[in-house]
């Protein structure tokens, strides 16, 4: 099979010419009832009274219920934001609401009381003006009249503020102060709204005093029941999210244990193999492969461990070290791996708070380990409105330490096929793995996504065993007695950890590219990310060769870059031309690791990177105008902007998702496309939740595959053309990579 290519060259960048939309406008044909504006005014008066009686914080928290999933450009511009600075900086939380199966945004703003008073004054002026105009409803024509003719000075309001307020009122359904009084009798992990006040100082205002070791981040902390009750009594408005601090390991069943004398034949010791980190229950050092595993018990010495506390973790490490021995049909060609195994839990359950503190310390102490396997998870379903604090902490760790977590998708012991995944499988930047049986059908114990009603989780699936027949299960070593047969997502994840470690440590790819290759190979030309959210993008191929190669009629290559500006692009990918046509189907997979902020709720990822890929067209009128004809008709980042509803942008183009996979459907009726310039192009567009340039410098990776409609191999033509246009072309050669790795790890003795 031909080897995948890696193209290296310069990307260009530029800023947008303009936003393309101008001032605030009502959607075409829509109106705002004056009675609705009066309702919002009444609600705001009640809110003002509430906060005049609450003096423990300096400002006011106000929740805005929008009428739908709202784009950044349609958030409030005047209502509640009559103070200096961008309105986005006032947002402290975001979540989804539902009514009659209709989904909408709820944003919580932290504003001044003066801001509320100004908004009340402006709303009153709006109502007075349109009452005087004898208007029961307001249309765009009325706003156009204001733009052209202005507003009498007696109303003490500018026309811009008037128009912005009316448009705000169209998109806003209601206003309120939310209070969290849900009773929990166990220790709780809570998230509070970020008010810019030191956490301990803020809690002391309510006679709550905690040590630093119970503070996870500036807004996430661990409270005892009496402390939570006190906070709910005195400041229920401050709690953004809460849940019990106890996650029970979803232990995967061990069945049909047998002994095999040949299980440990011909097993040599380790050399320079890459190391994978395992965070799990404990490791039995009496097993045959113990020389390959460095084990540390990170629990308190006061915790007495039982025999059961070693089974799960030992089984997971056995797959990573020597999985193909007992599972020859899953021989991936990756060889063996060393393991650094950290015991962070017992078989009976664990405090997720304590475990995550251990994990952060472990990662910081082991910077050489880039792939970490976490086959533990919660029985409890994830919230539709919040990323779990466990997942949020893992996402923070990944950004801070440049590592990649592989997380089991958790199991449903009741086999309902509708139970949502459990924390931390909602980690956005991690690779979350579900199980399939040997026929690639979803396992009976499958749990499903999505996360935050949007993000695809699980990412991919792999063979984790199912049923009662050993032929359909995963062979592992859990103790010194021999082989055991198991099933569960816990035993699918380690196989993916092996592949990622091979790609990163042996092949020498970065984590973006490794993750993109795994997802792209799983999705192929017939992605599985359907409405069931059970298998992710698909089932990853067994052989590592299939992940980093291509078919004879394909051109498959890797592009790596960094976000340089609003637009980062290349218009010079020389796709072969036949009779002035491009006879190819195309697909592309983009992966990047955005910063994530749990206190932003459903607006969790801070950066959107939009992907456009397709033929390049040069304007005949103005040759300086160059555009891409995207293979998926994505026009949301065109320089001549077109309005697309936020729901459509999310559903069709995965806006705000950190993985973009676009693919053309192969059909016998497909025809080659006209070659305009002879080039294809890539353009990525960076958009921020909050104004600024936080994404600048952020790396991304794209895997592109072109499949010849006529079945002809034109790889060499493509390579030659790339060289002509200053692309450096390398092939990803497994054998060469292994040889280079072995030579680089050889110890050299110098003569005295």
Ranges and model annotations:
Residues 604-618, 670-752:
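C-terminal edge strands of extracellular/lumenal beta-sandwich accessory domains
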Residues 54-90, 186-206, 585-653:
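Extended low-complexity, serine/threonine- and proline-enriched intrinsically disordered segments
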Residues 345-423, 484-487, 491:
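Substrate-binding/access-modulating region of protease and related hydrolase catalytic domains
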Residues 280-282, 288, 421-501:
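Extracellular S/T/G-rich loop segment that most often corresponds to the catalytic His/Ser-adjacent loop
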Residues 264-297, 302-352, 402, 427-429, ...:
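Subtilisin-like serine protease catalytic core
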Residues 2-268:
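Autoinhibitory propeptides
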Residues 24-34, 39, 43-54, 73-82, ...:
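Subtilisin-like peptidase catalytic core
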Residues 505-585:
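C-terminal subdomain of the subtilisin-like protease fold in secreted/lumenal serine endopeptidases
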